[in-house]
Amino acid sequence: MSGEPPFLFLHIPRTAGTTLNRLLERHFPPETVLSLYSREELQRYAVIDVAFLARLRLIQGHILLSDYDRFTFYDAPVRAFTFVREPVSRVISEYFFLRTWPANHLYALLNEQHITLSEYVTSKHKLLRYKGGNFMTRVLSGIDPDVEPDAALERAKSNLRDRFLFFGLTEAFNASLLLLAEAMGLGDLLYERQNALRRPVSQRADEDERALIAARNTLDTALYDFAKQLFAERVAAKGSSFTARLTRYETLLGKYQKVCALVETRLGVPLGEIEKPKD
């Protein structure tokens, strides 16, 4: 154990988190990583002992902090980080991913009941009611945005600015990785995209659907605009040397991903709706 609090990746769905998880897992021994995604994992690790917690260096999952005032998880301090994404695209991507990936717990519900995108966004079903409206604001603030919208938005903003060790943007993923590497002391940042829908989100919803999603996510849009501006300021503060590093990194990454694609083609890896789906 390093003596430092563990890192905690608060993974908002459809923000390139699966790609990031695979990259991060290369930097930490398996016994020091705790993943909390499935119901089984969440139930199994609902309570953990002090010795188990002490050896953890990375916790990752679709999770909430246990205490947003003290910024703790398992009643212990953590160094939390997250990624955010343009809200309309994120919701559309989540809906179509959940309808496409059979292993998720909403696949049967969405397909057997033929739930449309508009219904997904407005549903009061107990499994869907928090999905389509201001989800990022909810999980980054710890406040119900339906009850206290202004407080939730302001808390989410201040948490991103002051409490999170780091936040990145899905739309600036490579630049985000370089900044995350600095914050976490990481080395190798080469990656292949994981769990991505092959057909662009822009082709998956009509104008009326996009307008409905936007109307249901006004807080998330304000939060994303805030995050985008703050991220740009932090990148600008790094100066021209960071821009040069990013250019070199993206050149190397492009070569790496090209080689990976050639290997997959030669191996005859089948193409599906989801690119390199998670297990």
Tell me the role of every PLM-derived stretch.
Residues 216-220, 224-228:
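Short amphipathic alpha-helical coiled-coil/interface segments
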Residues 1-56, 87, 94, 99-100, ...:
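PAPS-dependent sulfotransferase catalytic core
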Residues 34-41, 152-218, 232-233, 237-253:
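The conserved 3'-phosphoadenosine-5'-phosphosulfate
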Residues 40-83, 89-192:
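PAPS-dependent sulfotransferase catalytic domain
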Residues 229-279:
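Long, low-complexity C-terminal extensions of enzymes
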Residues 2-4, 72-73, 205-206:
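Short hydrophobic/aromatic segments of transmembrane alpha-helices and their interfaces
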